């Protein structure tokens, strides 16, 4: 299947959070909505077909994740990383921010230092701060190749100097899309 990534779909005025939120807040029309991970490409026909098939059942109750979900994740990890994972390693959460909060409270204590690599999705810092942990920054470096890279010397220094207990690793990085 081919995709048309050149098709421009104007979503303004459709209650689209990405664009209409700024307008409702009195921001300029040309403000770039870099604060939300929302694509402007048309959804794949495979996704549309799956949604239509589910909607045609006429029931919109709560669903449970089936074995097929684990098999898809495990297969991807093995194909791309040659890593066999176990099913009990996967934890279902209602979203990334909730998962970050679980991670912080499960693996650190109040006052512990957590390493955050900027630029990154703002809840990585917000969840850390809101749970009374200390944010230690290891800022990513924009290289000559116009890609962000980890400053490994600073990374090591920050871990030792601040006795970092946890690294919030966003991979791929949201906002740059880099994969480490």
Language-model segments: residues:
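N-terminal small-domain helix-loop-helix segment of the aminotransferase-like
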Residues: 2-95
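Glycine-rich helix-loop-beta junction characteristic of Rossmann-like nucleotide cofactor-binding loops
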Residues: 82-83, 104-108
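Glycine/Thr-rich phosphate-binding loops of Rossmann-like dinucleotide-binding domains
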Residues: 100, 124, 176-177
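Conserved PLP-anchoring active-site segment centered on the Schiff-base-forming lysine
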Residues: 106-128
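Short beta->alpha connector loops at strand-helix junctions that form conserved
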Residues: 118, 137-142
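A short helix-loop-beta submotif of the ANL/AMP-binding
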Residues: 130-136
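Active-site phosphate-binding strand-loop segment of PLP-dependent enzymes
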Residues: 142-180
